[in-house]
Amino acid sequence: MSSNFKNLYTSNNPPLQATLMRGSKLESIHKIHAVISDKKGRVLMCAGNPEYKSFIRSSLKPFQAIPFLSSGAASEINNASKSIAVACGSHSGSNLHTREAFKILWEYDIDINYLKCPKLIRSPLEHNCSGKHAAFLATCKKLKLPLDSYLKR
């Protein structure tokens, strides 16, 4: 990311920090190095180290949910905000989360066996990515695309 355009609006602040509390107990702390760049990769603004290397993993999920929203698939689901939330993030496989992922499939009359995420204890719905996968399938159904190859598109 190096260029003479670098650091135009760079912050000297440390990385952003998110803390997760479970009741009154601190469960985890996450340091966030954030970068805004132009289409040529020039750093326009950052918090923390703009050169920090990381693996994108689940932080990509909100972007992967864009077709779910832009196709209109999400808006056809009753109380869509919860479905959008489970499509945009990882979850712990709780009943609340698995029900929401299932609701996406139910609303689009999609069999659970189409889910390609690994089957965990009892069901692929318990996988932390099941909401994202359910949203992919709902989008395919909305756009009349094949469900069995949704990961290949």
Please identify what each model-predicted range represents.
Residues 32, 62-67, 99-103:
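N-terminal, well-ordered alpha-helical segments
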Residues 47-53, 85-88:
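Short helix/strand-bridging catalytic loops that position acidic/His residues to coordinate divalent metals
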Residues 42-44, 74, 144-146:
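Short helix-loop capping/hinge motifs at secondary-structure junctions, enriched
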Residues 73-81:
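Phosphate-handling active-site elements
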Residues 56-74:
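Active-site SXXK
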